[in-house]
Amino acid sequence: MIQKVQIRTNPLITFSAVLHIGACAAVFWQVWLWPWALGVVIADHLLLVGCGLLPRSRTLGANLSRLPDAAAARGEIALTIDDGPDPLVTPQVLDLLDHFAAKASFFCVGTAAQGHPDLCREIMRRGHSIENHTQHHRYNFSLSGPRSLHREIAWAQSTLTNITGHKPHFFRAPAGLRNLFLDTVLIRLNLRLVSWTRRGYDTINRDPEKVLKLLLHNLRAGDILVLHDGNAALTRNGVPVILEILPLLLASVRGAGLHCVTLRAAMEAVVDVPAAPVPEPDFPLPHLIPAARGATL
Protein backbone atom coordinates (compact mmCIF):
# COMPACT_ATOMS: atom_id res chain seq x y z
CA MET A 1 0.00 0.00 0.00
CA ILE A 2 1.07 3.57 -0.53
CA GLN A 3 2.68 5.23 2.44
CA LYS A 4 0.87 8.42 3.39
CA VAL A 5 3.04 11.47 3.67
CA GLN A 6 3.23 12.68 7.25
CA ILE A 7 2.84 16.34 8.12
CA ARG A 8 6.24 17.85 8.85
CA THR A 9 7.25 20.97 10.70
CA ASN A 10 10.20 22.71 9.09
CA PRO A 11 12.50 24.10 11.82
CA LEU A 12 13.81 26.85 9.54
CA ILE A 13 10.33 28.14 8.77
CA THR A 14 9.39 27.97 12.44
CA PHE A 15 12.54 29.90 13.30
CA SER A 16 11.75 32.43 10.56
CA ALA A 17 8.25 33.00 11.92
CA VAL A 18 9.58 33.46 15.46
CA LEU A 19 12.19 35.87 14.10
CA HIS A 20 9.54 38.01 12.40
CA ILE A 21 7.42 38.09 15.55
CA GLY A 22 10.47 38.99 17.61
CA ALA A 23 11.43 41.78 15.22
CA CYS A 24 7.93 43.27 15.40
CA ALA A 25 7.92 42.99 19.19
CA ALA A 26 11.32 44.69 19.42
CA VAL A 27 10.14 47.66 17.34
CA PHE A 28 6.94 47.87 19.36
CA TRP A 29 8.99 47.86 22.58
CA GLN A 30 11.69 50.29 21.39
CA VAL A 31 10.96 52.02 18.09
CA TRP A 32 14.60 53.04 17.65
CA LEU A 33 15.44 49.34 17.13
CA TRP A 34 13.68 49.33 13.75
CA PRO A 35 16.88 49.40 11.61
CA TRP A 36 18.19 46.34 13.43
CA ALA A 37 14.84 44.57 13.17
CA LEU A 38 14.61 45.34 9.46
CA GLY A 39 18.14 44.06 8.90
CA VAL A 40 17.34 40.79 10.66
CA VAL A 41 14.18 40.30 8.58
CA ILE A 42 16.02 41.04 5.32
CA ALA A 43 18.80 38.60 6.24
CA ASP A 44 16.20 35.95 7.01
CA HIS A 45 14.52 36.43 3.63
CA LEU A 46 17.85 36.24 1.83
CA LEU A 47 18.57 32.97 3.62
CA LEU A 48 15.23 31.48 2.56
CA VAL A 49 15.70 32.60 -1.04
CA GLY A 50 19.23 31.23 -1.08
CA CYS A 51 18.04 27.84 0.13
CA GLY A 52 15.49 27.75 -2.70
CA LEU A 53 18.27 28.33 -5.23
CA LEU A 54 20.06 25.15 -4.13
CA PRO A 55 18.15 22.28 -5.81
CA ARG A 56 19.65 19.56 -3.59
CA SER A 57 19.15 21.41 -0.31
CA ARG A 58 16.88 19.89 2.36
CA THR A 59 16.61 23.12 4.32
CA LEU A 60 13.14 23.94 2.95
CA GLY A 61 11.79 20.42 3.34
CA ALA A 62 12.25 16.78 2.38
CA ASN A 63 14.20 16.34 -0.84
CA LEU A 64 15.27 13.04 -2.41
CA SER A 65 18.69 13.55 -4.00
CA ARG A 66 19.84 9.92 -3.70
CA LEU A 67 18.12 6.56 -3.64
CA PRO A 68 17.71 4.74 -0.31
CA ASP A 69 20.56 2.59 0.97
CA ALA A 70 18.61 -0.56 0.13
CA ALA A 71 18.41 0.47 -3.53
CA ALA A 72 22.10 1.35 -3.57
CA ALA A 73 22.92 -2.06 -2.10
CA ARG A 74 21.09 -3.64 -5.04
CA GLY A 75 23.30 -1.67 -7.45
CA GLU A 76 20.46 0.56 -8.62
CA ILE A 77 20.60 4.08 -10.00
CA ALA A 78 17.70 6.24 -11.18
CA LEU A 79 17.79 7.83 -14.61
CA THR A 80 15.30 10.70 -14.69
CA ILE A 81 14.34 12.43 -17.93
CA ASP A 82 12.74 15.88 -17.83
CA ASP A 83 10.63 18.33 -19.85
CA GLY A 84 8.97 15.92 -22.28
CA PRO A 85 7.43 14.16 -23.88
CA ASP A 86 8.94 15.30 -27.18
CA PRO A 87 7.51 13.63 -30.32
CA LEU A 88 10.89 13.50 -32.08
CA VAL A 89 13.25 12.71 -29.21
CA THR A 90 11.28 10.62 -26.71
CA PRO A 91 10.54 7.65 -29.03
CA GLN A 92 14.26 7.32 -29.78
CA VAL A 93 15.08 7.54 -26.08
CA LEU A 94 12.60 4.72 -25.43
CA ASP A 95 14.27 2.52 -28.05
CA LEU A 96 17.71 3.13 -26.54
CA LEU A 97 16.41 2.28 -23.08
CA ASP A 98 14.88 -0.93 -24.43
CA HIS A 99 18.16 -1.87 -26.09
CA PHE A 100 20.00 -1.68 -22.76
CA ALA A 101 17.10 -3.11 -20.71
CA ALA A 102 17.12 0.11 -18.68
CA LYS A 103 14.17 1.81 -16.99
CA ALA A 104 13.70 5.53 -16.42
CA SER A 105 11.39 7.99 -14.70
CA PHE A 106 10.03 10.64 -17.07
CA PHE A 107 9.18 13.94 -15.37
CA CYS A 108 6.62 15.19 -17.86
CA VAL A 109 5.19 18.66 -18.37
CA GLY A 110 1.39 18.69 -18.42
CA THR A 111 0.99 20.74 -21.60
CA ALA A 112 3.48 18.54 -23.48
CA ALA A 113 1.64 15.45 -22.27
CA GLN A 114 -1.67 16.87 -23.48
CA GLY A 115 -0.16 17.34 -26.92
CA HIS A 116 1.14 13.76 -27.08
CA PRO A 117 -1.04 11.54 -24.90
CA ASP A 118 -0.28 8.34 -26.82
CA LEU A 119 3.43 8.92 -26.29
CA CYS A 120 2.83 9.15 -22.55
CA ARG A 121 0.96 5.88 -22.61
CA GLU A 122 3.79 4.33 -24.63
CA ILE A 123 6.27 5.40 -21.95
CA MET A 124 4.19 3.56 -19.36
CA ARG A 125 3.63 0.54 -21.62
CA ARG A 126 7.38 0.04 -21.91
CA GLY A 127 7.77 -0.20 -18.16
CA HIS A 128 8.88 3.31 -17.27
CA SER A 129 7.13 5.75 -14.94
CA ILE A 130 5.72 9.22 -15.49
CA GLU A 131 6.10 11.81 -12.76
CA ASN A 132 5.01 15.43 -12.20
CA HIS A 133 7.06 18.33 -13.61
CA THR A 134 4.30 20.99 -13.38
CA GLN A 135 1.66 21.85 -15.96
CA HIS A 136 3.52 24.63 -17.80
CA HIS A 137 7.20 24.46 -16.72
CA ARG A 138 7.42 28.17 -15.98
CA TYR A 139 10.80 29.42 -14.81
CA ASN A 140 9.19 31.84 -12.35
CA PHE A 141 7.65 28.84 -10.58
CA SER A 142 9.74 29.43 -7.45
CA LEU A 143 8.32 32.95 -7.13
CA SER A 144 4.76 31.65 -6.79
CA GLY A 145 2.65 31.70 -3.65
CA PRO A 146 0.97 28.65 -2.08
CA ARG A 147 -2.21 28.86 -4.18
CA SER A 148 -0.35 29.22 -7.47
CA LEU A 149 1.98 26.36 -6.59
CA HIS A 150 -0.92 24.12 -5.66
CA ARG A 151 -2.87 24.98 -8.81
CA GLU A 152 0.10 24.36 -11.12
CA ILE A 153 1.12 21.05 -9.55
CA ALA A 154 -2.43 19.74 -9.05
CA TRP A 155 -3.26 20.63 -12.66
CA ALA A 156 -0.34 18.56 -13.91
CA GLN A 157 -1.27 15.76 -11.52
CA SER A 158 -4.76 15.64 -13.00
CA THR A 159 -3.48 15.88 -16.58
CA LEU A 160 -0.98 13.05 -16.23
CA THR A 161 -3.36 10.82 -14.27
CA ASN A 162 -6.13 11.24 -16.83
CA ILE A 163 -3.79 10.41 -19.70
CA THR A 164 -1.99 7.40 -18.22
CA GLY A 165 -4.43 6.10 -15.62
CA HIS A 166 -1.68 6.25 -12.97
CA LYS A 167 -1.01 8.98 -10.42
CA PRO A 168 2.49 10.45 -10.30
CA HIS A 169 4.16 9.90 -6.93
CA PHE A 170 7.15 12.20 -7.37
CA PHE A 171 7.61 15.86 -8.26
CA ARG A 172 10.48 17.92 -9.60
CA ALA A 173 10.39 21.72 -9.83
CA PRO A 174 11.45 23.50 -13.03
CA ALA A 175 15.26 23.84 -12.87
CA GLY A 176 14.98 22.45 -9.33
CA LEU A 177 14.16 25.90 -7.93
CA ARG A 178 11.61 26.20 -5.13
CA ASN A 179 10.50 28.26 -2.15
CA LEU A 180 9.38 27.78 1.45
CA PHE A 181 5.75 27.10 0.43
CA LEU A 182 6.43 24.09 -1.80
CA ASP A 183 6.91 21.49 0.92
CA THR A 184 3.45 22.10 2.39
CA VAL A 185 1.84 21.95 -1.06
CA LEU A 186 3.52 18.64 -1.85
CA ILE A 187 2.39 17.20 1.48
CA ARG A 188 -1.22 18.07 0.64
CA LEU A 189 -0.90 16.47 -2.80
CA ASN A 190 0.91 13.40 -1.40
CA LEU A 191 3.90 13.96 -3.68
CA ARG A 192 7.58 13.56 -2.89
CA LEU A 193 10.17 16.10 -4.06
CA VAL A 194 13.03 14.65 -6.11
CA SER A 195 16.17 16.51 -7.14
CA TRP A 196 19.31 14.67 -8.28
CA THR A 197 22.78 13.51 -7.39
CA ARG A 198 24.34 14.75 -10.63
CA ARG A 199 23.27 16.41 -13.86
CA GLY A 200 24.94 17.22 -17.17
CA TYR A 201 23.26 20.57 -17.95
CA ASP A 202 22.23 19.07 -21.27
CA THR A 203 19.73 21.84 -22.08
CA ILE A 204 22.56 24.37 -22.44
CA ASN A 205 25.72 22.28 -22.87
CA ARG A 206 26.15 21.28 -26.52
CA ASP A 207 29.29 19.23 -25.93
CA PRO A 208 28.32 15.55 -25.43
CA GLU A 209 31.71 14.69 -23.92
CA LYS A 210 31.35 17.31 -21.21
CA VAL A 211 27.80 16.24 -20.41
CA LEU A 212 28.82 12.60 -20.19
CA LYS A 213 31.80 13.43 -17.99
CA LEU A 214 29.58 15.31 -15.53
CA LEU A 215 27.20 12.36 -15.29
CA LEU A 216 29.83 9.64 -14.96
CA HIS A 217 32.29 11.38 -12.63
CA ASN A 218 32.31 9.36 -9.39
CA LEU A 219 29.11 7.59 -10.44
CA ARG A 220 27.99 5.08 -7.82
CA ALA A 221 25.01 3.02 -6.80
CA GLY A 222 22.12 5.08 -5.46
CA ASP A 223 22.74 8.09 -7.69
CA ILE A 224 19.91 9.98 -9.37
CA LEU A 225 20.83 11.33 -12.82
CA VAL A 226 19.06 13.98 -14.90
CA LEU A 227 18.78 14.27 -18.68
CA HIS A 228 16.26 16.03 -20.92
CA ASP A 229 14.18 14.73 -23.81
CA GLY A 230 12.35 18.05 -23.97
CA ASN A 231 14.27 21.30 -24.51
CA ALA A 232 17.37 19.29 -25.34
CA ALA A 233 20.45 21.17 -26.51
CA LEU A 234 21.70 20.20 -29.95
CA THR A 235 25.23 19.08 -30.77
CA ARG A 236 27.14 20.75 -33.60
CA ASN A 237 25.70 18.05 -35.85
CA GLY A 238 22.14 18.96 -34.88
CA VAL A 239 21.56 15.86 -32.75
CA PRO A 240 19.88 16.23 -29.35
CA VAL A 241 22.54 15.74 -26.69
CA ILE A 242 20.56 13.03 -24.90
CA LEU A 243 20.54 10.86 -28.04
CA GLU A 244 24.28 11.31 -28.50
CA ILE A 245 25.28 10.35 -24.96
CA LEU A 246 22.59 7.92 -23.81
CA PRO A 247 24.13 4.81 -25.43
CA LEU A 248 27.53 5.62 -23.90
CA LEU A 249 25.97 6.41 -20.53
CA LEU A 250 23.95 3.20 -20.39
CA ALA A 251 26.92 1.13 -21.54
CA SER A 252 29.06 2.69 -18.80
CA VAL A 253 26.37 2.02 -16.19
CA ARG A 254 26.20 -1.61 -17.26
CA GLY A 255 29.98 -1.88 -17.29
CA ALA A 256 30.08 -0.63 -13.70
CA GLY A 257 27.75 -3.43 -12.63
CA LEU A 258 24.86 -1.01 -12.05
CA HIS A 259 21.38 -0.92 -13.51
CA CYS A 260 18.79 1.80 -14.09
CA VAL A 261 15.41 1.47 -12.39
CA THR A 262 12.43 3.75 -11.98
CA LEU A 263 12.08 5.79 -8.82
CA ARG A 264 9.00 3.76 -7.97
CA ALA A 265 10.94 0.50 -8.17
CA ALA A 266 13.77 1.91 -6.07
CA MET A 267 11.41 3.19 -3.39
CA GLU A 268 10.00 -0.16 -2.37
CA ALA A 269 7.29 1.29 -0.10
CA VAL A 270 5.67 3.14 -3.01
CA VAL A 271 3.34 0.99 -5.06
CA ASP A 272 1.63 2.16 -8.24
CA VAL A 273 -2.15 2.38 -7.95
CA PRO A 274 -4.20 2.51 -11.17
CA ALA A 275 -6.64 5.39 -11.46
CA ALA A 276 -9.70 5.61 -13.68
CA PRO A 277 -8.53 7.25 -16.93
CA VAL A 278 -10.46 10.01 -18.64
CA PRO A 279 -10.89 9.30 -22.40
CA GLU A 280 -8.44 11.27 -24.52
CA PRO A 281 -8.31 11.65 -28.33
CA ASP A 282 -5.99 9.19 -30.02
CA PHE A 283 -2.91 10.51 -31.79
CA PRO A 284 -0.56 8.22 -33.74
CA LEU A 285 2.94 7.90 -32.35
CA PRO A 286 5.47 9.81 -34.44
CA HIS A 287 7.97 7.90 -36.57
CA LEU A 288 11.52 7.80 -35.28
CA ILE A 289 13.58 10.37 -37.14
CA PRO A 290 16.99 11.84 -36.29
CA ALA A 291 16.03 15.49 -36.55
CA ALA A 292 14.89 17.38 -33.46
CA ARG A 293 13.71 20.78 -32.46
CA GLY A 294 16.10 23.45 -31.30
CA ALA A 295 17.07 23.88 -27.69
CA THR A 296 15.51 26.37 -25.35
CA LEU A 297 16.64 27.33 -21.89
What is each model feature region?
Residues M1-S65:
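N-terminal membrane-anchoring alpha-helices
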Residues G50-L53, S57-A72, N237-L297:
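C-terminal domain-boundary segment and adjacent tail
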Residues G52-F141, W155, T159, H259:
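Active-site beta->alpha N-cap acidic-glycine motif
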Residues I81-D83, C108-G110, N132-T134, A173-A175, ...:
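A cross-domain feature marking catalytic cores of carbohydrate-active enzymes
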Residues G84-L88, C108-P117, R138-R147, R172-L180, ...:
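Acidic-and-aromatic substrate-binding clefts and catalytic sites of carbohydrate-active enzymes
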Residues L94-C108, H128-S129, G145-N179, T184-R192, ...:
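CE4/NodB-like, metal-dependent polysaccharide N-deacetylase domain
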Residues H136-Y139, R199-G200, N231-L234:
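A short, flexible beta-alpha/helix-coil linker loop
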Residues L177, L182-N218, L258-A269, H287:
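His/Asp/Glu-enriched short active-site or ligand-binding loop at hydrolase and phosphoryl-transfer sites
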